Amino acid sequence: MTMENKPAGQNGLTYAQAGVDIDAGNLMVEKIKPLVRSTRRPGADGEIGGFGGLFDLKAAGFKDPVLVAANDGVGTKLKIAIDADIHDTVGIDLVAMCVNDLVVQGAEPLFFLDYYATGKLSPDQGVAIVSGIAEGCRQAGCALIGGETAEMPGMYRDGDYDLAGFAVGAAERDRLLPRGDIAEGDIILGLASSGVHSNGFSLVRRIVELSGLGWKSQAPFQPGATLGEALLTPTRIYVKPLLAAIRACDGIKALAHITGGGFPDNIPRVLPKGLAAEIDLPAIAVPPVFSWLAKTGNVEPNEMLRTFNCGIGMIAVVNPAKVDEVIAALAAEGEKVVTLGRMTRREKDGVIYKGQLAL
């Protein structure tokens, strides 16, 4: 229809009328620029807003680097954040899920990008999310160099959103993990988790539903916090302590990030075919949240171990002669470390449990 024959009083449709507010997106970008600047590190000192993020690998000081990449999300933990209207911690989870997967390969996280998709963009909600992402990047020592904010009416309900993260790191070629000398008798150390982290939340939400509690209810397992606040405790980022321990002593042979699938699905991923991890379950100090979930949902111990981290967010396989040095290096960085078991010859399963989990 030409301008000449358009009916009088009829206005053309706009993108905003279709549900996409470009001005809101631009406002959010301006608000997050200081957050992005706070994550600068050697190799990344540019501004966001270009068509791509830049990183100078030479400035990061590597000599013979291998790039390592990972991407992940936060899963249905986001549903709790949305329903509880708490959005400033899930960004930490997003970074943690990616960078913890880098450090288990011996890599130092260098930069991070995020993808934030929503039905209707709220700049304040978006800024809260990015503030968490920036905090996660600072904890991991990586730069937030870009991202994508997608307002998609019709794809998501107003207020709903999803997140995805992308991290790239680097390791010197001769420092990659797992090492090839993992042997029977090597010691298994466990690093404490901060809580549920970012896996198993479909089961968590079902258990909360059965309990009859709401997200604003007092958390039965954490005095002084609501259930939403307690369950949204951010995933622990292990990057700086593990890199410090790797660099301080040549003792860590392998690392495993305990995510979905728990011990039985994650530990064997870093082990040679002929070896298994023997885990002393009574050595694990199980946080109260897991005991509450198990009892309230009547969840069997083996199901707990295959769904949740149960208090151990990271596993390290260590040279027996270096165990004390590794524990000291990790403790100096604030990590709670427990000796969990040892490597043994594999007969069937990649993980062998000894004793019972104290749920």
Curated annotation (Swiss-Prot):
Disulfide bridge partners, by residue number: none
UniProt keyword annotations, A-Z: ATP-binding, Cytoplasm, Ligase, Nucleotide-binding, Purine biosynthesis
GO biological process, one term: adenine biosynthetic process
EC number: 6.3.3.1
Pfam families, A to Z: AIRS (PF00586), AIRS_C (PF02769)
Coiled-coil boundaries: none
InterPro entries: PurM-like_C_dom, PurM-like_C_sf, PurM-like_N, PurM-like_N_sf, PurM_cligase
Any one Gene Ontology cellular component term annotated for this protein: cytosol
GO molecular function: ATP binding; phosphoribosylamine-glycine ligase activity; phosphoribosylformylglycinamidine cyclo-ligase activity
Pathway field: Purine metabolism; IMP biosynthesis via de novo pathway; 5-amino-1-(5-phospho-D-ribosyl)imidazole from N(2)-formyl-N(1)-(5-phospho-D-ribosyl)glycinamide: step 2/2
Catalytic activity from the UniProt record: 2-formamido-N(1)-(5-O-phospho-beta-D-ribosyl)acetamidine + ATP = 5-amino-1-(5-phospho-beta-D-ribosyl)imidazole + ADP + phosphate + H(+)
Transmembrane helix recorded as keyword: no
Highest taxon of source: Bacteria
Nucleotide-binding recorded as keyword: yes
Predominant subcellular localization, coarse grouping: cytoplasm
Compartment(s): Cytoplasm
Family: Belongs to the AIR synthase family.
UniProt name for this protein: Phosphoribosylformylglycinamidine cyclo-ligase
Gene from which the chain derives: purM
